[in-house]
Amino acid sequence: MFIKKLKKLENTDLASALVKRTVADLQNRIYKHKNPIALKKLATNIYKVSQQHPLAKPLAKVAQQATNYACQLESQLDIIAKQVIKNGTEINGRSGRFTQMLNRHGNANALVRTVESAVGAKNFYKLVDKHSVQYTAEFFVAKYMPFAVSKDLLNEIHQLLSTIEQPTLLKQVA
């Protein structure tokens, strides 16, 4: 759509104004995103568009900014996930299987995969019994990465967390 508009404009001043306005709009859109996965897809699409017309080259820089911001968001999630895992394993212990999953997928993705495989597993209830719900994979996914799981799974997590009697923590998730 953008390329079609750009090709229709014969005046280069109007075309460059369109590109500048589009760059500004995209930069505003980028920093409103909190989902690194969607942001990377957006960056890919922006880059593809930037290669289709000579006047659209400034969009490549915007795509690079989007990619950098997505990486920054991912690293923030990994730092939080690492702390959740550290505190949770101090309380509950760590299995070899989970360590292997951490090495293979990274901290945040390991927590998401744990929740995808089983919501409310025995480790969840062990941490609940020790009043450490904030260190569960379910709590992490519900609070920080709801975009990484399906809506059905997210509803299941919210139902599970609503059965726990720790209202101050549950307000953080909702």
Which positions does each model-derived feature cover?
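Charge-centric, low-complexity intrinsically disordered segments used as regulatory activation/interaction regions
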Residues: 3-6, 47-54, 76-79, 172-173
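A short structural micro-motif
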Residues: 24-25, 49, 117-122
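Short, hydrophobic/amphipathic alpha-helical patches that form generic packing surfaces
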Residues: 41-48, 97-100, 110-116, 138-143
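Charged, low-complexity interaction regions
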Residues: 12-19, 27-41, 50-59, 89-90
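Contiguous, amphipathic alpha-helical segments that mediate oligomerization or scaffolding
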Residues: 36-39, 52-65, 69-88
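Amphipathic alpha-helical binding modules
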Residues: 62-63, 67-73, 91, 117-119, ...
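Amphipathic alpha-helical packing elements
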Residues: 84-130
